[in-house]
Swiss-Prot record:
Name by which UniProt lists this protein: Threonine--tRNA ligase
Stretches for region Catalytic: 242-533
GO cellular component, one term: cytoplasm
Annotated source species: Legionella pneumophila (strain Corby)
GO biological process: threonyl-tRNA aminoacylation
Family stated for the protein in its record: Belongs to the class-II aminoacyl-tRNA synthetase family.
CDD domains: TGS_ThrRS (cd01667), ThrRS_anticodon (cd00860), ThrRS_core (cd00771)
GO molecular function: ATP binding; metal ion binding; threonine-tRNA ligase activity; tRNA binding
Subunit structure: Homodimer.
Length: 637
């Protein structure tokens, strides 16, 4: 006779086994109607799950954090059912949940078209409205293989053949459609009220380019229509803000097939890049870093010693000359240890903070490349701090101060922190891990930082803090990393003479703030929709003449601005002023300085912003002072 403990601490006693739906109905008919699934002793199950023994139970409704994954997984099955109804010869393969949605891969003799997607989505709504019951059954492995083969579903049979023989196989049926799945699923298709198919793309079977190409249909699903509409709005906004489109429209950069995943920076884009580098260089000097430069092409022997050759070889560009094998560096860490090792180090030399704008190359798969967000050639704001175990906390605290300050200057104030803790397989003693993890926690506490623990997700060589930004659309971008490393210094024979004269191995702290310049620029462009803050804008002001009579004065204004350190340009073309204003507004130039006869006479400029705000007339000195102060304030405006 099961006793069921509910989240509020109450225990319900039942005289016989019963389903989760029955428990929900016992509490209230409304809860039973809203129940999507249940969590029994921490495990998600269907509402049809039979409770036979004492347990704790959370009844999952659409308001519960678990509901979205279940809704999306069930909607993927609804998609597959609709495709099979409309295109019976299509074979189903896999349909997992992904961030903000789901996809399903199909084997079909032709590509699905946008018109097909509209038909499929309409069929999905029809099936959802039918409120078909979703039921679960189990089959022995071999019987399941034969069952799907009899349906002509060869891919599904192959998937089952790869599942261990002792693993229970469950199938879910809705109407005349049945699919292999672990579950859980919603009780009926009527729970699926808010979904949208978003796109179709090609995908190789099992992700292997040697296999056949499948058709992947993507979709999104939410608990209610309001959430779906909000997501679709964000998706539309993200499309408008796509850094690849803005990069072309604003003449910042481009990509070419002659150098896949490598950026061709145009003058305006390179200006932004240089501003980032200049800013970071100055901040690092303030925090006691010494900038270094290491080779890009390094002998294979170093990568073997560091462990990168064994674990990272497929992502490295390699070459051979004079019977020696070299690799273009995918990261700077081993080279930084070489600089540390050059000369005897004492405990008095620690902490030693080395930084580099490391030019790195990684052989990312061509299908994974995505504008500035995923490239093969990137520059990282790499830094490595060599310190003692006792210095970890103070060094990490200093890094966190720098991280928070830098992100604030770029206009990001909502930062999420994640602490990746020791994995099962690791180097170093438990005492050392205890000390390192405690140091990271105390450093964050000292900065009043809230974080989420991620047990088991640390690297084998040390715990780490991950710093993620939230942009204007609520998207999360992991950029900063503070990684403790107990392994590499020992592998590469780094040492120092301790106070007692003994030879000791330093701890190495890997630190990145922006991550890569390329990706961070992509994030900035999308966050600001191309309207970068004044201090980052490639052209900060443009002087616009009404007629050629003001050309000489416009040149004088531009030169004055430039002498004050403001990136200024002028437009002397014989075009109407309205045309000029519109054109430079579309180019997202922060300030438009219009000069006509009256402005020339009074040594003034008429000031407009790119948002169309008229700031009136100002003297040249006043506009210079105004822009200079805004540049100094950076993200604190």
């Amino acid at each position: 006779m099961p006793n069921v403990k509910l989240p509020d601490g109450n225990v319900k006693h039942f005289e016989a086994p019963l389903t989760i739906y029955d428990v929900a109905h016992h509490i209230s008919p409304g809860l039973a109607k809203a129940a999507i699934a249940g969590r029994v002793d921490g495990v998600l199950v269907d509402t049809s799950y039979l409770i036979k023994e004492d347990c704790s139970l959370i009844i999952v409704t659409e308001k519960h954090e678990d509901s979205l994954e279940i809704i999306r997984h069930s909607t993927a099955h609804l998609l597959a059912q609709a495709v099979k109804a409309l295109f019976p010869s299509a074979q189903v393969t896999i349909g997992p949940v992904i961030e903000d949605g789901f996809y399903y891969d199909f084997a079909f003799e032709r590509s699905f078209t946008p018109d097909d997607l509209s038909l499929i989505e309409a069929k999905m709504h029809e099936l959802a409205k039918a409120n078909l019951s979703i039921t679960r059954r189990e089959l022995p492995r071999n019987e399941a293989i034969q069952y799907f083969k009899s349906l002509g579903e060869e891919y599904k049979a192959k998937i089952i053949a790869d599942i261990p023989e002792n693993e229970a196989l469950s199938l879910y049926r809705q109407g005349d459609f049945e699919d292999l799945c672990r579950g859980p699923h919603v009780p009926s298709t009527g729970f699926l009220k808010a979904f949208k198919l978003t796109k179709v793309a090609g995908a190789y079977w099992r992700g292997d380019s040697n296999n056949e190409m499948l058709q992947r249909i993507y979709g999104t699903a939410w608990a209610d229509k309001k959430s779906l509409e909000e997501y679709l709005f964000r998706l539309e906004e993200a499309e408008k803000r796509d850094h690849r489109k803005l990069g072309k429209a604003l003449d910042l950069f481009h990509f070419q097939d002659i150098a896949p995943g490598m950026v061709f920076w145009h003058p305006k884009g390179w200006t932004i890049y240089q501003e980032l580098e200049h800013y970071m260089r100055n901040r690092l000097v303030d925090f006691g870093y010494q900038e270094i430069r290491t080779p890009q092409l390094v002998d294979r022997s170093l990568w073997e010693k560091s462990g990168h050759w064994a674990n990272f070889r497929d992502e490295m560009f390699v070459t051979e000359t004079e019977n020696r094998h070299y690799a273009v560096k995918p990261m700077s860490c081993p080279c930084h240890v070489q600089i540390y090792n050059h000369g005897l180090k004492s405990y008095r030399d620690l902490p030693l903070r080395l930084s580099e704008f490391g030019n790195c190359h990684r052989c990312e798969p061509s299908g994974a490349l995505h504008g500035l967000m995923r490239v093969r050639n990137m520059v990282q704001d790499d830094a490595h701090i060599f310190c003692t175990e006792d210095q970890i906390q103070s060094e990490v605290a200093m890094m966190l101060e720098l991280v928070q300050s830098v992100y604030k200057d770029f206009g990001f104030t909502e930062i999420k922190y994640r602490l990746a803790l020791r994995p099962e397989k690791r180097v170093g003693s438990d005492d050392v891990w205890d000390k390192a993890e405690t140091a990271l926690k105390l450093a964050m506490q000292g900065r009043n930082i809230e974080w989420v623990d991620a047990p088991g997700e640390g690297a084998f060589y040390g715990p780490k803090i991950e710093c993620s930004l939230s942009d204007c659309l609520g998207r999360i971008w992991q950029c900063g990393t503070i990684q403790v490393d107990f392994s590499m210094p020992a592998r590469l024979e780094a040492s120092y003479v301790a106070e007692d004269g003994s030879k000791q191995t330093p701890v190495m702290l890997h630190r990145a703030i922006l991550g890569s310049f390329e990706r961070f620029m992509g994030i900035l462009i999308e966050h600001y929709a191309g309207k970068l803050p004044l201090w980052l804008s490639p052209v900060q002001a443009v002087v616009l003449t009404i007629s050629e009579k003001q050309n000489e004065y416009a040149e004088k204004v531009r030169k004055t601005l430039q002498k004050r350190g403001i990136r200024a340009n002028f437009d002397l073309r014989n075009e109407k002023i309205g045309f000029k204003i519109r054109e430079h507004t579309l180019q997202k130039i922060p300030y438009l300085l219009v000069v006509g006869d009256k402005e020339v006479e009074n040594c003034q400029v008429a000031v407009r912003t790119r948002d169309g705000i008229d700031l009136g007339v100002m003297t040249i000195d006043t506009i210079c002072d105004t822009l200079t102060q805004e540049i100094i304030r950076k993200g604190s405006i």
